[in-house]
């Protein structure tokens, strides 16, 4: 019985540690992979082909120059 209680407490403690140490995905929009790459490639000679607004995209699609929300490429101003 004591061993079971110790195991339950240990699992709860480790779960709490994982939740505390997990990355916060709310800041993903501020530091997205696309924006970081654009900052590194920001030269006058670099041209990107962008998808038009309201075209289908995926969440990791780099052809959507603006935001990809619900599989649609949206223009943010």
UniProtKB/Swiss-Prot annotation:
Coiled coil located at which positions?
none
**Signal sequence range:** 1-22
Q: Pro-segment residues?
A: 23-46
Q: Where in the cell is the protein located?
A: Secreted
Q: What is its main location?
A: secreted
Q: Which GO terms describe its molecular function?
A: ion channel inhibitor activity; toxin activity
State the UniProt keywords alphabetically: Cleavage on pair of basic residues, Disulfide bond, Knottin, Neurotoxin, Pyrrolidone carboxylic acid, Secreted, Signal, Toxin
Provide an example Pfam family for this protein: Conotoxin
Question: What is the top-level taxon of the source organism?
Answer: Eukaryota
Q: Does the keyword Ion transport apply?
A: no
Record's GO cellular component terms:
extracellular region
| Secreted is among the record's keywords | yes
Tissue localization of expression is:
Expressed by the venom duct.
Q: Which residues carry this modification: Pyrrolidone carboxylic acid?
A: 49
- What InterPro entries is this protein classified in? Conotoxin
Which pairs are disulfide-linked?
50-65, 57-68, 64-73
Q: Which family does it belong to?
A: Belongs to the conotoxin O1 superfamily.
Q: What is known of its domains?
A: The presence of a 'disulfide through disulfide knot' structurally defines this protein as a knottin.
Q: What is this protein called?
A: Conotoxin ArMKLT2-022
